[in-house]
Amino acid sequence: MPDYRSKTSTHGRNMAGARALWRATGMKDDDFKKPIIAIANSFTQFVPGHVHLKDLGQLVAREIERAGGVAKEFNTIAVDDGIAMGHDGMLYSLPSREIIADSVEYMVNAHCADAIVCISNCDKITPGMLMAALRLNIPVIFVSGGPMEAGKTKLASHGLDLVDAMVIAADSSASDEKVAEYERSACPTCGSCSGMFTANSMNCLTEALGLALPGNGSTLATHSDREELFLRAGRTIVELCQRYYGDNDESVLPRNIANFKAFENAMTLDIAMGGSTNTILHLLAAAQEAEIDFDLRDIDRLSRHVPQLCKVAPNIQKYHMEDVHRAGGIFSILGELARGGLLHTDLPTVHSKTMAEGIAQWDITQTSDEAVHHFFKAGPAGIPTQTAFSQSTRWDSLDDDRENGCIRSVEHAYSKEGGLAVLYGNIALDGCVVKTAGVDESIHVFEGNAKIFESQDSAVRGILADEVKEGDIVIIRYEGPKGGPGMQEMLYPTSYLKSKGLGKACALLTDGRFSGGTSGLSIGHASPEAAAGGTIGLVQDGDKVLIDIPNRSINLLVSDEELAARRVEQDKKGWKPVEARPRKVTTALKAYALLATSADKGAVRNKAMLDGL
């Protein structure tokens, strides 16, 4: 049986000094015989998805100690992508993922912790903690802060979210009063933004990976039911410690739970629910940390036969995360996928021996357990608040309509192919990604003229100045992981295209990425990126580009000979923007850019370069 890692700092005469310091934190003699469990919290008052987490770490800590463990809490950073968007703050968003992963590794390894509870929620925090968990490979469980309630206003017939506020603000025909009403109504409570944006997508995927409890991705941050998820996480992590350290059961380790098949399950769910394209970036990064050979080709393969079973904002205005929960949450989507033969159900999870057992217990269409049905009736209260577990509202009934409801069966899918696709061609030799769930079928094949912008800022200026016309393909380059640096999200350009009435009349291609709130023919993650010598850096204004989603292709309609000649010239000039960009690239960002790989590798650090040092 493996020894507790913590024995390194708690046992032996030579550790008297370390024990003295542990005692100063409150530990007693008996505590040195127990597992020391790290609680990686991410409370911050900057982010609505994290503003309510302050006391939740100690809630989990008390439950860990009741169950026989020793809990020690620390915090990571958390960047709000929505607040950082539209200025140089967005340069820091993706790099913060690596900082979060490193900080968890640093704290856990420096103090020899035996296990981790990851309290995450928003865009880069869940991925960063996931990367750390797979790096460390010690018992772990994820419990996130939960989604925000959808906003309500008399001016809209549907629930509101952050994207609605951004789009209406960019609409010159909207009055200041209407804009203000949307702004005040779009984000009414604590929690991660209410649609299937990046944060909620990632928290749902932790369920599919087997590293979180059922309901983690869909139970509202404000609902009292979410408290039990935190308490149960505290009890479960102690059980996982006992199984690993006491019973030598390696099946509880994250790399044995989140193995290749589990990554296929997570991606299958992502495609079926029309998740954010950012999830692809983060799953690829997490797979690299786990030393799993899971790449864009695997995602491409899955995307061709997994149907879309769920449509949620921003892909449709009718449904938000609260509606997904009412329809049975993630385990109901997993149940439909399993019935369609599209899921590996023989894999272990942190809460059940196999995924099949978990589905049987938690899929509302399979179980008659009234407690489970009661759990998924948890709904929104419609009361603005920043307090967790502050309401206990319940729907009168569940949405178990698998023909026309929020979650569909395979037979009644929204589309036979899922909500994400990988495209290849001469403009993206290593692939690029499009969220097909948000693309109107009328423009699944689109040929247009390239309109080049060498930064997001210049693209925004060009769109607002009406430089972009119907039929154009907006190309924003040198915004990749290395070229940005930091791979900015392009939510403002896509929102402004919508506000100009060009949402279905134009396309956008970038080596940057998109917010989970993006919809329309928006293609990101073009790899290799321009700064790494990618073909996207060779496109010229007016070049024809053909996008063909059904055939998974994207090509610059320029001869190979012409491209070769352009490459020779670009090599002489250097792969950098032609125009000067008024952005301050600090030492921290330069360090990130130096090691960053392109998006097809998850924008992780270039380990081959590091190994050569």
From Swiss-Prot:
Which Gene Ontology cellular component annotation is one that this UniProt entry carries?
cytosol
Enzyme Commission number(s) from the entry: 4.2.1.9
> Reaction(s) catalyzed by this protein?
(2R)-2,3-dihydroxy-3-methylbutanoate = 3-methyl-2-oxobutanoate + H2O; (2R,3R)-2,3-dihydroxy-3-methylpentanoate = (S)-3-methyl-2-oxopentanoate + H2O
Sorted keywords for this record are:
2Fe-2S, Amino-acid biosynthesis, Branched-chain amino acid biosynthesis, Iron, Iron-sulfur, Lyase, Magnesium, Metal-binding
The source's superkingdom equals: Bacteria
Q: What class of enzyme is it?
A: lyase
* Cofactor(s) listed in the protein's UniProt record: [2Fe-2S] cluster; Mg(2+)
- Which residues of this protein are catalytic? S515
Looking at the keywords, is Cytoplasm present? no
Protein transport as UniProt keyword: no
* Co-factor remark: Binds 1 [2Fe-2S] cluster per subunit. This cluster acts as a Lewis acid cofactor.
* Pfam name, any one: ILVD_EDD_N
Name any one GO molecular function: 2 iron, 2 sulfur cluster binding
Residue positions of the PTM N6-carboxylysine? K124
Binding positions for [2Fe-2S] cluster per the UniProt entry: C122, C193
GO BP: isoleucine biosynthetic process; L-valine biosynthetic process
Q: Relate the assembly described in the record.
A: Homodimer.
Q: What does this protein do?
A: Functions in the biosynthesis of branched-chain amino acids. Catalyzes the dehydration of (2R,3R)-2,3-dihydroxy-3-methylpentanoate (2,3-dihydroxy-3-methylvalerate) into 2-oxo-3-methylpentanoate (2-oxo-3-methylvalerate) and of (2R)-2,3-dihydroxy-3-methylbutanoate (2,3-dihydroxyisovalerate) into 2-oxo-3-methylbutanoate (2-oxoisovalerate), the penultimate precursor to L-isoleucine and L-valine, respectively.
Family under the similarity heading: Belongs to the IlvD/Edd family.
Q: This chain belongs to which protein, by name?
A: Dihydroxy-acid dehydratase
Source organism (scientific name): Pseudomonas fluorescens (strain ATCC BAA-477 / NRRL B-23932 / Pf-5)
Please spell out the taxonomic lineage of the organism that makes this protein: Bacteria, Pseudomonadati, Pseudomonadota, Gammaproteobacteria, Pseudomonadales
